[in-house]
Amino acid sequence: MASSSNVNGNLVDELEEAFQSCIHALTKEESATGVDKDEIKLEVDQTTLKFIDLARQMEAFFLQKRFLLSALKPDLLLKEENFDLKQEIARKDELIRKHYEKIESWKNLLSDQQNYNKPIQSLPPDMRGNLTGGVPGGPGMMPGGIGMPMQNSMQVQQMQAQQQQMQMLQAQQMQQQMQSMPIG
């Protein structure tokens, strides 16, 4: 009687030959061989069925070996399951960590957005004083000679433009993050 490794070796060789003949039948051209389409189709079907049959035999062989191994050494199966569970836990921990990072970045974006949307009254008192004309050096005149109402309106316009730019930048960042987030 042949040993199991010899049978397995023969089975592997037969599977490889069946695969090669299947590929050969699929790539054969009818004009070059003088064989019509029906004969080629029949050959493809036969070689494919043989390949599938040998693949099932190979699968059955490995299942038998796995069953023998589980019966003779159950501790190996437990070690394998333990290893698989550890890998699964590590993968899920990494996924959770990535979600927490995204949540933190979203929190930061939202808090930044809320800070930029605060009205001018929330500015520090020294900046509010500049906007209302409370600058030392003369009523209504800046040291550079620009009138206070004009200077105030320029500062307000600059601040509004900066706020709009920041809001647009944040909106773009949020869109990019939403596009990079996996669905599901």
UniProtKB/Swiss-Prot annotation:
Function in brief: Component of the Mediator complex, a coactivator involved in the regulated transcription of nearly all RNA polymerase II-dependent genes. Mediator functions as a bridge to convey information from gene-specific regulatory proteins to the basal RNA polymerase II transcription machinery. Mediator is recruited to promoters by direct interactions with regulatory proteins and serves as a scaffold for the assembly of a functional preinitiation complex with RNA polymerase II and the general transcription factors.
Domain of life: Eukaryota
Location (main, coarse): nucleus
Keywords on record: Activator, Coiled coil, Nucleus, Transcription, Transcription regulation
Gene Ontology cellular component terms for the protein in this record: mediator complex
Coiled coil (UniProt feature): 77-105
Keyword Acetylation assigned: no
Family: Belongs to the Mediator complex subunit 28 family.
Gene designation per UniProt: MED28
Self-association and partners: Component of the Mediator complex.
Protein name per the record: Mediator of RNA polymerase II transcription subunit 28
UniProt subcellular location: Nucleus
